[in-house]
């Protein structure tokens, strides 16, 4: 028989840097999960993606065991990395902070494809372009 799910926890944690301190500790401690076990497993699984923020969905079962699924990094994080900026513009419609080539947008869209609700890479590109626009990043051909 399948184990009964008692809690779903969604977190965004820097790759390879999960530790028992907040936000990880309190979120998992309430569910009675072995926090160090999760941290070690998460860090091992995301060691190759250092520097990126990784969304993770943790499913906690009745017997306090857990499974987790790592998602692709948020489009905003990938855009900031490609553009080489620290943060987006406070006034995206007035001041633009960077420009990104369309082929880089395609790369990001292809990376995000498994997690996006898009039928094609072109649709995913439009989503990523919208994120870029809201951050004050100009897309050029």
Swiss-Prot record:
Keywords from the UniProt entry: Methylation, Ribonucleoprotein, Ribosomal protein, RNA-binding, rRNA-binding
SMART domains: RL11
Single GO MF descriptor: large ribosomal subunit rRNA binding
Keyword Ligase applies: no
InterPro entries in the record: Ribosomal_uL11, Ribosomal_uL11_bac-typ, Ribosomal_uL11_C, Ribosomal_uL11_C_sf, Ribosomal_uL11_CS, Ribosomal_uL11_N, Ribosomal_uL11_N_sf
UniProt record, GO biological process: translation
SUPFAM superfamilies: Ribosomal L11/L12e N-terminal domain, Ribosomal protein L11, C-terminal domain
GO cellular component, one term: cytosolic large ribosomal subunit
PTM entry text: One or more lysine residues are methylated.
A Pfam family matched in the record: Ribosomal_L11_N
The keyword Glycoprotein is assigned to this record: no
Domain of life: Bacteria
Membership in a protein family: Belongs to the universal ribosomal protein uL11 family.
Subunit structure: Part of the ribosomal stalk of the 50S ribosomal subunit. Interacts with L10 and the large rRNA to form the base of the stalk. L10 forms an elongated spine to which L12 dimers bind in a sequential fashion forming a multimeric L10(L12)X complex.
Entries under PANTHER family matching the protein: 60S RIBOSOMAL PROTEIN L12, LARGE RIBOSOMAL SUBUNIT PROTEIN UL11M
Function: Forms part of the ribosomal stalk which helps the ribosome interact with GTP-bound translation factors.
Name of the protein in question: Large ribosomal subunit protein uL11
Organism encoding this protein: Bacillus anthracis
UniProt gene name: rplK
């Amino acid at each position: 028989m399948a184990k009964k799910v008692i809690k779903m926890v969604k977190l965004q944690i820097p790759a390879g840097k999960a530790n028992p301190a907040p936000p990880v500790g309190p979120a998992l401690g309430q569910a009675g999960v072995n926090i160090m076990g999760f941290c070690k497993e998460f860090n091992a699984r995301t060691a190759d993606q250092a520097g990126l923020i990784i969304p993770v969905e943790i499913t906690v079962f009745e017997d306090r065991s857990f499974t987790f699924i790592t998602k692709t990094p948020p489009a905003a994080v990938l855009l900031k990395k490609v553009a080489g900026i620290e943060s987006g513009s406070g006034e995206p419609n007035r001041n633009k902070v960077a420009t990104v080539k369309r082929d880089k947008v395609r790369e990001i869209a292809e990376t995000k494809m498994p997690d996006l609700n898009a039928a094609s890479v072109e649709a995913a590109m439009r989503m990523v372009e919208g994120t870029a626009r809201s951050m004050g990043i100009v897309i050029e051909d």
